[in-house]
């Protein structure tokens, strides 16, 4: 954090804060009575790393489910458009417009509400291994879990999911590795399972899209969109301020504009309102065609196989941008809805994006999560 001191001298300092979430006493949130089974499964799974072939199999397996979600997104863009007027559409209650079923979602309702406790902020630099160790000790002091008896109980019985940004997660994994040969389960940090926060991952995804598709004011990228929409301050990705919020809004606006124009192109309609004459089933069919022909890897590959004299590089760029915009919107909606299975389906493609985009840090985070989900975690920890 930065702030002004007397004499107008700028001063930089570091601090750490944390929030404790306690799940309700419900079967869906039950962790094992002891962490012995969890530790054994982790140790066994670590000996069998997930392979590239297995990751690609997960990617292929998830593709049909992601396609269904993308079709629904494109369909909702149409019916939610002001020109369509869903509330007065004859078939507004059609099941075609309902959200596709998902296999795994977080339970909702008052019975599943989490208790939340904000801890005191401390002047500790969490960016270092030493700082993370200091913070662990301070946190357990605040929670009154720093007695020998409580430490023993934590080491043998408790499993604590520790979520943070990429740097925090990386430091905690490194700290666990450094202390893996210590004497007790508590000192070895066997009770702690670090996991990255999805909000930070989503910000990295948005930054990756900005870097890849910024382009020029004369092209089809974001630079031209910013100019047309009158967006200011989005030219370079920033961590501070409201850049992410403003850029995410622009992503949604650009995606909506792209796909509404495709609706008109593929149906031959002169306006969005004209599509009210179509049945829900017809609209759903058109949405499938839009995703397949204008926003899929298959469409991109088909374009790339054309003879050099027939290739349309501009069309290829638009198809790729549309595909990646849908992927971002899918991740955003899955997180907001608590649809865990949809988030998990996106992990392989997120890995490919971060690895290909030279974001090695989040590529490692995705690899770690895939390894834990498919090799190391017990079912109740998942």
Please name every model-derived segment.
Residues 1-382:
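Buried hydrophobic core signal strongest for RNase H-like alpha/beta domains in large
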């Amino acid at each position: 954090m930065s702030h002004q001191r007397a004499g107008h001298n700028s001063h930089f300092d570091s601090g750490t804060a944390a929030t404790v979430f306690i799940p309700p006493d419900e079967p869906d949130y039950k962790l094992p009575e002891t962490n012995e089974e969890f530790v054994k499964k982790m140790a066994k799974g670590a000996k069998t790393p997930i392979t590239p072939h297995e990751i690609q199999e997960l990617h292929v397996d998830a593709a049909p489910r992601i396609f269904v979600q993308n079709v629904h997104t494109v369909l909702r863009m149409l019916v939610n458009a002001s020109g369509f007027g869903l509330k007065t559409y004859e078939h507004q209650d059609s099941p075609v417009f309902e959200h596709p079923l998902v296999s795994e979602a977080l339970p909702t309702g008052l019975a599943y509400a989490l208790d939340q406790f904000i801890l005191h902020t401390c002047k500790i630099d969490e960016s270092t291994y030493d700082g993370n160790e200091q913070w662990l000790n301070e946190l357990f002091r605040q929670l009154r879990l720093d007695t020998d008896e409580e430490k023993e109980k934590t080491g043998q019985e408790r499993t604590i999911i520790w979520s943070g940004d990429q740097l925090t997660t990386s430091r905690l994994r490194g700290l666990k590795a450094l202390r893996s040969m210590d004497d007790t389960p508590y000192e070895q940090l066997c009770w702690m399972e670090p996991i990255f926060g999805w909000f930070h991952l989503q910000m990295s995804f948005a930054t990756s899209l900005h870097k890849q598709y910024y382009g020029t004011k004369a092209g089809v990228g974001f630079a031209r969109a910013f100019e047309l929409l009158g967006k200011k301050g989005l030219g370079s990705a920033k961590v501070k301020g409201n850049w992410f919020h403003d850029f995410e809004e622009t992503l949604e606006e650009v995606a909506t504009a792209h796909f509404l124009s495709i609706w008109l192109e593929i149906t031959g309609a002169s306006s969005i309102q004209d599509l009210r004459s179509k049945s829900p089933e017809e609209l759903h069919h058109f949405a499938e065609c839009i995703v397949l022909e204008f926003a899929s890897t298959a469409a991109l590959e088909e374009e790339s196989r054309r003879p050099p004299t027939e290739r349309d590089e501009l069309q290829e760029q638009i198809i790729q941008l549309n595909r990646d915009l849908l992927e971002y919107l899918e991740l955003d909606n899955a997180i907001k809805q608590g649809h865990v299975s949809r988030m998990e389906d996106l992990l392989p493609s997120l890995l490919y994006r971060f690895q290909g985009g030279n974001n090695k840090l989040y590529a490692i985070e995705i690899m770690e999560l895939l390894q834990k989900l498919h090799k190391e975690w017990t079912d109740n920890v998942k």
